[in-house]
Amino acid sequence: MTQMDDAKNGIITEEMKIVAEKEKIDIEKLRKLIAKGYVVILKNVNRDTNPVGIGQSLRTKVNANIGTSPDCVDIELEIKKAKIAEKYGADAVMDLSTGGNLEEIRKAIMDAVKIPIGTVPIYEVGKLAREKYGRVIDMNEDLMFKVIEKQAKEGVDFMTLHCGITKQSVERLKRSGRIMGVVSRGGAFLTAYILYHNEENPLYKNFDYLLDILKEHDVTISLGDGMRPGCLADNTDRAQIEELITLGELVERCREKGVQCMVEGPGHIPINYIETNIRLQKSLCKNAPFYVLGPIVTDIAPGYDHITAAIGGALAGYYGADFLCYVTPSEHLRLPTIEDVKEGVIATKIAAQAADVAKGNKLAWEKETEMAYARKNHDWEKQFELAIDKEKARKMREEIPSKEEKACSICGDYCALLMVEELGKR
């Protein structure tokens, strides 16, 4: 039984109770949202995960991507990244490793943190195919499903699977006139497979079998957007929307099977198209939780893409995106460092909080109100406690202190709050 099955049957699970308490939402309302597929709870039955709820009426959640590459394989470094992501408030981590012993790396990360862990199984499939047959495109159906089942048994909580890439969508891509083609790595693996073998995507062709595997372990499927645009110039084009229509159909099949699902989205979107993208997804995918990468709102800021993504993420969250995948300062440039991971998580947490405030979330507003009173009362310890980055706030205040203990060194004796307070005492 999955969380969705239980919810449909009127059963309130321990995981639902935990999420309801965290989110301060009525448990019966939460159960109904899960039954409809509007909320998912990330929690594999085989792993001792702290369950996380994502979707309608809940706070906007944040994911951090980590993982090795063929050029940089350091398990201890990835463990540190996972821990720093968890420390600064990431709600989930995805292990996107492509270098080294992927099973060993994945298990080490899963042991290091309690938050949900996601993967993109096709990466391991491609790596194994290359090692066994010489090329990624020589992967086969049997290998794909063996890897997916193995990861499900290991305890992976959610998986990105690019089931919406089809022979038809690849043909439409060819005619699209895109500048950048396919920029999703998993999407590229499957597009190349279709083009080379002239066969349908096995994940689409055997979707019911895939759902049977995921259902057994209550793995949430994150329907990947392999046709997402890789630049603003390609945004919201026919190839992207073709895939989204297919994903909407697959959402309905997930719900019929009782498998929890969410849908992934772009990517690179100009600000004036963010609302359009969110509304399209929510309509076509029947209010399935929406998981967006950023989105980045300008392509000319390499080194600062945590900022471009936070701008887009705040707007996307406000318009209805439920899950924001962070972007680090090193995006498009190199593998992220520990500091990059920290900066990416913090920037995206800021975006999520801004979105939740705009949506009127009670928990978000409680924090804002507490901070207002802490500043009014010159309660610096409370301000540090409420800060998204507590250490940085404390460090910056201590670097250039004020002679006036209650004030900061921007105003010192001329602190506006103190001045009016003194006059008010007369």
From Swiss-Prot:
Gene3D superfamilies given in the database record: 6.10.250.620, Radical SAM ThiC family, central domain (3.20.20.540)
InterPro entries: ThiC, ThiC/Bza_core_dom, ThiC/BzaA/B
Bound cofactor: record note: Binds 1 [4Fe-4S] cluster per subunit. The cluster is coordinated with 3 cysteines and an exchangeable S-adenosyl-L-methionine.
Keyword flag Acyltransferase: no
UniProt-listed Enzyme Commission number(s): 4.1.99.17
One Gene Ontology term of the molecular function aspect: carbon-carbon lyase activity
Any GO BP annotation: thiamine biosynthetic process
UniProt keyword Zinc present: yes
Ligand binding (substrate): N65, M94, Y123, H162, S184, R185, G186, D225, G226, M227, R228, E264, Y291
Residues at which Zn(2+) binds: H268, H332
Cofactor: [4Fe-4S] cluster
Catalyzed reaction equations: 5-amino-1-(5-phospho-beta-D-ribosyl)imidazole + S-adenosyl-L-methionine = 4-amino-2-methyl-5-(phosphooxymethyl)pyrimidine + CO + 5'-deoxyadenosine + formate + L-methionine + 3 H(+)
Pathway as given in its UniProt record: Cofactor biosynthesis; thiamine diphosphate biosynthesis
Keywords: 4Fe-4S, Iron, Iron-sulfur, Lyase, Metal-binding, S-adenosyl-L-methionine, Thiamine biosynthesis, Zinc
Pfam families, alphabetized: ThiC_Rad_SAM
NCBIfam families registered for this protein in UniProt: PRK13352.1 (NF009895), thiC (TIGR00190)
Record protein name field: Phosphomethylpyrimidine synthase
Organism: Methanocaldococcus jannaschii (strain ATCC 43067 / DSM 2661 / JAL-1 / JCM 10045 / NBRC 100440)
